[in-house]
Swiss-Prot record:
The protein's name in its UniProt record: Transcription antitermination protein NusB
Keywords per UniProt: RNA-binding, Transcription, Transcription antitermination, Transcription regulation
Biological process annotations from GO: DNA-templated transcription termination; transcription antitermination
Function: Involved in transcription antitermination. Required for transcription of ribosomal RNA (rRNA) genes. Binds specifically to the boxA antiterminator sequence of the ribosomal RNA (rrn) operons.
PANTHER family, alphabetized: ANTITERMINATION NUSB DOMAIN-CONTAINING PROTEIN, N UTILIZATION SUBSTANCE PROTEIN B-RELATED
Family: Belongs to the NusB family.
Disulfide bonds: none
GO CC annotation: cytosol
UniProt superkingdom: Bacteria
One Gene Ontology MF term: RNA binding
Organism this protein belongs to: Chloroflexus aggregans (strain MD-66 / DSM 9485)
């Protein structure tokens, strides 16, 4: 499988994760039911489904920690007042950057994906906001890893 096709599949999985997490956060629907409904409605490869499950459940499980990181990086923007799309995009990206031990997606790829999701689904300012928050987090927490990826 080529890199472009894999990247495109990963992008679709991240879109699904964003939509699931947004729905669960905004409606209090049960996360496992929303995820399974999505997998039934939009079948995907076993590898993509596993990635989706890891993103959704991992991000949701660690959301309190991820929200603290967001608030440290953007102290003027309380998470509970943040647009739902921005919050979900940031949570997913931070889960990938700080917690997910399986993928170890390169920092630049995670940031680029998050910015693209913010452009696709957020407001006019979402992509700049997401990029700024993630840049701050990388500087504070991941500078050594970023240098090693260069």
């Amino acid at each position: 499988m080529g890199r472009v096709r894999l990247a495109s599949q990963r992008h679709r999985v991240r879109i699904a994760a964003l939509q699931i997490l947004f729905e669960v956060d905004e409606t209090d629907h049960a996360i496992d039911q929303v995820l399974e409904r999505r997998l039934t409605d939009e079948p995907m490869s076993a590898e993509s489904a596993e990635f989706l499950r890891r993103l959704v459940f991992g991000t949701w499980e660690h959301r309190s920690y991820l929200d603290r990181i967001i608030e440290e990086a953007a102290p003027n923007w309380p998470v509970n007042q943040m647009p739902g799309v921005d919050k979900a995009v940031l949570r997913i990206a931070l889960f990938e950057l700080l917690i997910d031990e399986v993928e170890k997606t390169p920092i630049k790829a995670v940031i680029n994906e998050a910015v693209e999701l913010a452009k696709e689904f957020g407001s006019d300012n979402s992509s700049r906001f997401v990029n700024g928050v993630l840049g701050t987090v990388v500087t504070r927490y991941l500078a050594e890893r970023e240098a090693n990826e260069e």
